[in-house]
Structure formats: structure tokens, C-alpha cells
From Swiss-Prot:
Belongs to the UPF0182 family. It is a multi-pass membrane protein. The keyword Transmembrane helix applies. InterPro entries: UPF0182 (IPR005372). This is UPF0182 protein NT01CX_0852. It comes from the Bacteria. Pfam families: UPF0182. The keyword Metal-binding does not apply.
Length: 908
């Protein structure tokens, strides 16, 4: 018998090991990976916190439930004359109760530890906001870090108490009915006698129910105290947060209900012990009356008193809402100034703002990305996932540029090439970046590259020593490096592959034990069977940079647009990280949050995957709390290496939230807010001539702000009056040097009757211009599709300069959009020209007084035969076809080039 028990126990141990083997292996691999990236303490903190909390909660639940059951068992023993339970039933019941106690305790402990470990750590390590809420005079940290945990524990405890009370009554009724049936009592209307029931339940579990009843009422008391604190998030009034009715009526009722519940808990406990029902009913009725009265009285008060005097009574609460919303979204210190439009822009003004003019963006992100992917991807498995906008010194000159990393898209590998070896051992990394100026295009209207091709052709003056990208936005597969196979680096002009094996220092070594672990973890025996993997091989895991940072610090929110940076000859990724909350008192929610800070910049090495978290907003209490919980995770801003700061950008995701808040919260007067007279909308735009309207995306521009001496990069958004298309303000975020994060708002005077054109009105003006409209119609008639680029509205010397690039796309499947014209507008003038220089020249009469020499030069340029232009274009197309291995197209272009040259040599 003992031998059988041992075998059964051994069988269960083996079965459990097999069932949980993968989870155990996952934990081991996580430990190895976190150690390798330098954040083992972060993982162990989370892991040990969950385990410790699980054990603690399990023991508390198990002991509490076990003690509760034992106390009922004692009552059963004392009252066997009333409830007869045979020995066999006792034995079975004991096993069932033990099993249920174990299961319930495990379930509660598991859910609580996984759901609340972080809240408990936040509670214990909370940092003060040093801002108090206006109703309870408590620091905001209580609402952010402590109230959520209190509320969660309250809900869990209330559910547990109700469950125990219900189970107690059900068990008693079951045993009572079972005994009465066993004794042969008839089942009729007198089967359950209320007096016998009261007496029996008191003997069976009187003390237990008394304690449960008292605890339930104490829970209700705490619940109404929590409801009182939650009035800080009340939606009842004109503005979010506690209203006049909430503070004068509802709050008082909640406090009264809380006090009555405490007193009732004592009365109910004694009443249960004395088998008296009336006091219990009286307490329940009193609490119910108070609950119903609160709803009736507060509703009547709101309708009869507040509605007729709403502006006066709600003014303090509107002011609270305005103050706390601005604080919560970081818009409390916006530098605001009036921007009167004098429209006195001239040639001298443009010369004084030369860098602004030179950096006007005539390339657009969407069209440029399409061109990058068709021309610069080189092979079908390369992809440019996104274009980033940044500023670099191009050959010593401050320039805004487009920059995009060339990554491998494993989904685009040909079916036959999509093997395990290719995906994980050969195609291990992307290659380099392409960079083009935003302010210029080629003669054909294509991006003006300063970095391109493979190997890199770099005329930018920005050095890149190591162009490989092992960690990126599209690197969703693990890579095994330093194997017997060579890693594909880039495609040579000859069509052969250049190879370059990994020379970084990251990755987990593929020892025999580790190969076994990864075979189990990935469910793939190739880790063990592959002869290409050696003991010197390394596995690079979690290479998707967004997934990587989420694995290390999942409690932060991350920007949707990581961007690549060249620094000291290497490639790095920068990701903006946010702290958010939905528990900031009186702050109007935007989506599901009502507090947000861009507190952290994450910098990731594209080759080694080294990931560093830098705190850039040390005044954020949430990030301060996390840094206490996870010492060693975050680094100080002073530790950021030289060369990164000049590429930090104010993030668009954060700015978009702030713009949404500014639509209503730019006002300073509560009366204006109440009347809703000065509400704004983020401006809308159109991408196609007859396309649908869409919300304008804030643009990164290099410009000189009013009153400033130098140009800088600004994130700029345009605001319209609510549900109208005339522009009312410009809102910008600065990001260069010490000005990072400073917000500026330029308001146009509203007293004048003149309309300030928004992006939509500007586009309508373009379509209404007869000259431009004819030109656009002519292009459409020739089978070309006309597309708008990104609209730019640039403030210069109390004037607005409007710029709109126009793209032409041939009506064919694989056509590439080319920037063919630029529309520039100032005041009532609207100019369509081949480039920005010509447009400005016509707009401000640059060249009316120029001498004849310049005119002759221009005429000579214009007299270049069309055949030479065609020859140049055919030559470039032939070279491009050669690089892509398209020899048929190459031959056709060379033949046509020869025909043109013959024609030039033998003119008629």
C-alpha cells in the first residue's frame, strides 16, 4: 500500500514537472536574459514580489478559512443533538473542506499577487506631488498610489465576506434539510420553521455570522468613505471633478452612511448572537433609506438650486478643474503671446530669417517613404518601416533631414528562402540608413539623398562606422550569430552578397545546456540538431526594440514612433516613455488617462541592444516612485552621453494629448470656460485634392520664434475656432538645448474681421485659383494623379508664409510620386513654381532689379536641349536597373540612350 502511494506521488511529481516544464524553462531563460541586459535586479524584484505576496496571501487565506471552518466544526460537535452528522460524513466533509480551502486560497493568492504586487510597491514607495486636492486637502499621491490599492482590497474583502456568509447559510440549510428528511419529516410549508431556523443557525454559526455581519457593515462604511474620495472624479457638474452638489449634499450623505454603518456593525453583531432579527432589519432599512435619500435629495438639489444659479455656484469647481487639468497634462506654464498679423513681409525679412527659409520642408513624409521603399530598399526583403525627422549638421550646416533605417522584413522573404537557417542564422540584421534633405529635391522631383545605397554612399559629413541594425522596429525574430554560416550583410553591385559576422558583445552563449533550454522554450529541436551552431554562437533575443523595453519596464507607456539617431559613428534608437494615470483629482480625462508626463528617454544600441533608461523629468512623482521600487533601472539625465541631446525630439504622441487638452483649457477665465465661447479644434487637412478631411498632424519645423535670435526645431500645431475653418492660434513645443519641453502659444487677434487661413482654407484657396486650377486639371487630364504634400504655415515677422508641395504620380501600379511644383502663399498672393526659390522670387519680386548677366545665365540654363535632360534621366534609370538586377530594363534604357546620342550627333 505504501509502495503504491509512493508511486502515485512520484507519478504526480513527474506529471506536474512536464506540465510546468516550459514555464520553468521560461523563468530560467528570463533570468539569463535579464542578467545579460543588466536588469536582473528588476526582474527579480518583480518575481520575488509576486512570489512573496502569493505565499503571504495564501497563508492568510488558508489560515483564516481553516480557522473559520474549525469554529463551525466545534459548533457542530456541541450541537449534535440538533444536527446529526455521522462519522463517515465527517471524514468525507473534512477532506472536501480541506480541498476547497486549498483551492480557494490558491485562487485568491494567485489573482491577488499577480494583480496587486505593483500597487502594493507603489503604495509603500509613493513620492509626494506636493500638491493637495481642494476638497479633502490630501496630497495627490494618495489618489494616485494609495486609493487604488485601498479600493482593490475593499472589493476583494467584500466579495470574500459575502461568499463566506452565503456558504455558511447554504451549508447549514443543507445539513438541516438532510437531517429532517432522514428523520422522516414531511416536506410541507412548515418544513422550515423560521424560529427553529434562527435558533439553529445561531447555534450552528452564530459567532461566525456575527463577525461576518459586523465586518460586512464595516466594509460598507469603508466603501462609502472610498465613494467620498472618488467624488474627485465626479462627472456630475459642468467640469470634471466634484461639483457644488457633490460637496454640499452627496459628501455629507456618504459620511453619514459611513458612520451609521460603523454603529450598525456593532448592533448587528450583538443581534445575531442574541438571535434577534428586528435590530438587524432596522439597521438595514436605515442604511437603505440614507442611500435612497442621497440620490433623491442630490438630484432635487441639482435641479432646483444649482441649475438656476449654475455659473455662480460652480465657478470654484470649474477653477479647480482648469487648474488641475493643466497641471496633469503639463500645460500650466505655456508661454502665451498675441501674434498680430501686420503682413509686412519683404525680401529683407526673408534674409533675416535665412535659416528658416532654407529649411522649409518641401518633401513630405508619406511620399518620401514610398520612394525610399521602391528605390532604396534594393531587395524585396528590406523595408523602411518609417521616416523620422531630425536635424543634423550636413557638411557643417544646420539642416532638417528625413532619416530612415533599412531593416529586414522576414515576412517578405521568398517562400523557398524562408527557412529556419535563413531567418535566424543568415538574415540577421538590417543595413544602414538613408538620409535626404527636407528642403530640396533632385531635378526630377525625387528626394535629395546625402546618405544612400549599400554599401553606404555618404556625402553628409555625418560619419557612420557601423551601419548594421540587429535591433529595430521590424526585428521580430531571434537571431543566432557567430555560427558556421556567414551572415548576409548587403548586396554588391555584382549581384553577390557581402557578408559580415556579428562583432558585438550581446547575446546568450549557446552552450549545450542553453541549447536544450531554448529547444524547449521555442519548441524547436533545430537548436540541438543544427551543426551550424557552436559553443561560441550567441542568441540575440527580444530584438524588437518596443517589445524589448516593454519587457524590461512594462509599467511605462511607450511612444508609437521610435527614431534612429547617428552618434559617434554608431546607430542608436531613441524611444520616448511616459508615466500615465487615470486617478488625478479634478483632471479632465482624455481617452482613458488624466495625467501624463514624458519622463524618460530610452536609448538602445542598434548593434549590441544595450538599453538605458534616462529620467529627463525628475519632478514627476510617478517616475520617482518607480525609481525607488527599482533602484538601478533608471539613470540620471546627467549620464546621457554627449551627442544625443541635440537629437532629442518632443514626442508627437504626448504633444497630441496636450493639443487635445488645449482645445478647451487654453482659457484662463472660468466664465469663458462655462459659456464654451472660446473652444478650439485642432486644424484639419487634406492629402488629395478631393480627399476627405483628416486631423492635421503636428509638424517638426526649423524656424526662428518671435523674439528669438536663432533658428531651432519646433513641433508646431494649428488651431481653428470650434467647428470652423479659420485659424485662431499656433501652438508649439521647443526642443533644442535648454529649451526642451517649453511650450509656446501664439494667438491671432480675434477683433478683426479678416480670416486667417487654416490648412483646409489654404487648400480651398488653391483650388479656387484659376491659374493653378487649370494647371492641376491639365495634369489630371494627362493621366497623372496630383497629391498634396504636408502643408506648412510658417510665422515670420508677424506674417504667415504658406507652403504646399505638389506631387505628381503616374497612373500606373508601381509609379513613384515626384515633387514637381511648390505653391507658396502670402497675404492674397498665391504662386505656383518649380521650386521654393522661384516661388519666393515671384512672390516678393526678388529679381526685378537684377542685371542682365543673371538673366543670360538663366536663359542658358533654360536653353539646354530636352534631349540632354532625357539622356540624363535614362542614364540614371539604367544605373538603377543595373543595381536591382533588372537587365531587361537596363538594356532598354541603354538602347534609348543610344538613340538620343545618335540624334544629337546627327542633327537634321
Amino acid at each position: 500500500m505504501r509502495k503504491n502511494k509512493v508511486l502515485i506521488g512520484l507519478f504526480f511529481c513527474i506529471a506536474l514537472t512536464v506540465i510546468f516544464l516550459k514555464k520553468i524553462v521560461n523563468v530560467i531563460i528570463n533570468i539569463k536574459w535579464f542578467r545579460e541586459v543588466g536588469y536582473l535586479s528588476v526582474y527579480l524584484k518583480r518575481f520575488t514580489s509576486v512570489i512573496s505576496l502569493f505565499i503571504l496571501v495564501f497563508l492568510i487565506c488558508f489560515v483564516a478559512i481553516k480557522t473559520y471552518c474549525r469554529s463551525i466544526k466545534k459548533n457542530l460537535s456541541k450541537n449534535e443533538s440538533f444536527i446529526d452528522v455521522d462519522i463517515e460524513s465527517k471524514s468525507k466533509g473534512k477532506k472536501i473542506i480541506n480541498a476547497l480551502t486549498l483551492i480557494i486560497s490558491l485562487f485568491i493568492a494567485l489573482n491577488f499577487s499577480l494583480g496587486y504586487w505593483d500597487k502594493i510597491l507603489e503604495f509603500m514607495n509613493s513620492s509626494k506631488f506636493n500638491v493637495k486636492d481642494p476638497i479633502f486637502n490630501m496630497d495627490i499621491s494618495f489618489f494616485i498610489f494609495k486609493l487604488p490599492l485601498i479600493e482593490s482590497i475593499y472589493n476583494s474583502l467584500l466579495s470574500l465576506l459575502i461568499l463566506l456568509a452565503v456558504i455558511t447559510v447554504i451549508v447549514y440549510m443543507f445539513l438541516n434539510i438532510k437531517d429532517r428528511v432522514t428523520l422522516g419529516h414531511k416536506i410541507d410549508r412548515n418544513f422550515i420553521n423560521i424560529n427553529n431556523f434562527k435558533s439553529g443557525i445561531t447555534k450552528f454559526a452564530g459567532k461566525q455570522l456575527a463577525i461576518l455581519g459586523a465586518l460586512l457593515l464595516l466594509c460598507i462604511s469603508v466603501g462609502y468613505l472610498i465613494k467620498a474620495w472618488n467624488l474627485s472624479y465626479s462627472p456630475r457638474g459642468v467640469a470634471f471633478g466634484a461639483s457644488y452638489t457633490d460637496t454640499k449634499i452627496t459628501l455629507k450623505f456618504y459620511i453619514a452612511i459611513s458612520i451609521v454603518s460603523i454603529i450598525s456593525s456593532i448592533i448587528v453583531a450583538f443581534s445575531i448572537l442574541k438571535s434577534k432579527v428586528k435590530p438587524i432589519i432596522s439597521c438595514v432599512i436605515l442604511i437603505a433609506v440614507l442611500v435612497i435619500s442621497e440620490r433623491v435629495v442630490s438630484g432635487a438639489w441639482q435641479m432646483l438650486v444649482v441649475k438656476s444659479n449654475e455659473r455662480r455656484l460652480e465657478t470654484p469647481f470649474i477653477e479647480y478643474n482648469m487648474k488641475y487639468t493643466k497641471k496633469a497634462f503639463g500645460i500650466a506654464n505655456v508661454k502665451e503671446q498675441l501674434y498680430p498679423l501686420t503682413n509686412v513681409l519683404n525680401k529683407k525679412s526673408l534674409e533675416n530669417n535665412k535659416e528658416t527659409i532654407n529649411n522649409i520642408k518641401i518633401n513630405s513624409v508619406g511620399q518620401a517613404l514610398e520612394f525610399y521603399n521602391q528605390v532604396e530598399s534594393k531587395k524585396n526583403y528590406y523595408i523602411f518601416n518609417d521616416i523620422d525627422i531630425d536635424r543634423y549638421k550636413i557638411n557643417g550646416k544646420y539642416n532638417q533631414v528625413f532619416i530612415a533605417p533599412r531593416e529586414i522584413d522576414y515576412e517578405k522573404l521568398q517562400e523557398k528562402a524562408n527557412t529556419w537557417q535563413n531567418k535566424h542564422l543568415t538574415y540577421t540584421h538590417g543595413y544602414g540608413v538613408v538620409m535626404s534633405k527636407v528642403n530640396s529635391v533632385t531635378a526630377e522631383g525625387k528626394p535629395d539623398f546625402v546618405i544612400k545605397d549599400m554599401p553606404l554612399v555618404n556625402t553628409s559629413g555625418v560619419e557612420i562606422k557601423d551601419p548594421r541594425i540587429y535591433y529595430g522596429e521590424k526585428t521580430n525574430e531571434y537571431a543566432i550569430v557567430n555560427t558556421k554560416l556567414n551572415e548576409m550583410d548587403y548586396l554588391k553591385d555584382s549581384g553577390e552578397n557581402a557578408t559580415k559576422n556579428y562583432d558585438g558583445d550581446s547575446g546568450i552563449k549557446m552552450s549545450f545546456i542553453n541549447r536544450i533550454l531554448f529547444a524547449i522554450n521555442k519548441g524547436d529541436m533545430k537548436f540541438l540538431l543544427s551543426s551550424d551552431i557552436t559553443s561560441d554562437s550567441r542568441i540575440l533575443m527580444n530584438r524588437n526594440i518596443v517589445n524589448r523595453v516593454k519587457k524590461i519596464a512594462p509599467f511605462l507607456k511607450y511612444d508609437n514612433n521610435p527614431y534612429i539617431v547617428i552618434n559617434n559613428g554608431k546607430l542608436y534608437w531613441v524611444i520616448d516613455a511616459y508615466t500615465v494615470s487615470n486617478a488625478y483629482p479634478f483632471s479632465e480625462p482624455i481617452g482613458d488617462i488624466n495625467y501624463m508626463r514624458n519622463s524618460v528617454k530610452v536609448i538602445i544600441d542598434a548593434v549590441n541592444g544595450t538599453t538605458n533608461f534616462y529620467i529627463i523629468d525628475k519632478n514627476d512623482p510617478i517616475i520617482s516612485t518607480y525609481s525607488k521600487i527599482f533602484p538601478g533601472l533608471f539613470k540620471n539625465e546627467s549620464e546621457i552621453k554627449e551627442g544625443f541631446r541635440e537629437h532629442f525630439k518632443y514626442p508627437q504622441d504626448y504633444f497630441a494629448i496636450q493639443c487635445k487638452a488645449m482645445e478647451r483649457y487654453h482659457v484662463k477665465n472660468s466664465g469663458t470656460f462655462f459659456s464654451g465661447q472660446n473652444v478650439w479644434d485642432v486644424a484639419k487637412t487634406q492629402k488629395d485634392i478631393d480627399g476627405k478631411k483628416s486631423v492635421n498632424e503636428a509638424s517638426y519645423l526649423i524656424m526662428k520664434l518671435p523674439g528669438e535670435k536663432n533658428e531651432e526645431m519646433i513641433l508646431l500645431q494649428y488651431f481653428n475656432q470650434y467647428q470652423r475653418e479659420n485659424m485662431i492660434a499656433l501652438f508649439g513645443a521647443r526642443m533644442d538645448n535648454s529649451n526642451y519641453g517649453n511650450l509656446v502659444l501664439y494667438k491671432f487677434p480675434t477683433t478683426k474681421s479678416e480670416t486667417v487661413n487654416s490648412p483646409i482654407l489654404f487648400k480651398q484657396k488653391i483650388k479656387q485659383d484659376t491659374t493653378i486650377s487649370k494647371e492641376l486639371s491639365l495634369w489630371d487630364a494627362k493621366g497623372s494623379q496630383v497629391q498634396f504634400g504636408d502643408t506648412m504655415i510658417i510665422p515670420i515677422d508677424n506674417s504667415l508664409l504658406y507652403v504646399e508641395p505638389l506631387y505628381l504620380r503616374a497612373d500606373s501600379e508601381r509609379s513613384i510620386p515626384e515633387m514637381k511644383r511648390v505653391i507658396v502663399a502670402y497675404g492674397d498672393k498665391l504662386i505656383l513654381a518649380e521650386n521654393i526659390e522661384k516661388a519666393l522670387s515671384q512672390l516678393f519680386d526678388y529679381d526685378k532689379k537684377n542685371d542682365a548677366k543673371e538673366e543670360v545665365i538663366l536663359n542658358k540654363k533654360e536653353s539646354v536641349p530636352d534631349e540632354l535632360k532625357d539622356a540624363k534621366e535614362l542614364y540614371e534609370k539604367a544605373i538603377e536597373a543595373q543595381k536591382q538586377g533588372n537587365w531587361a530594363e537596363y538594356g532598354e534604357n541603354i538602347k534609348r540612350l543610344g538613340d538620343i546620342l545618335n540624334k544629337l550627333n546627327h542633327p537634321k
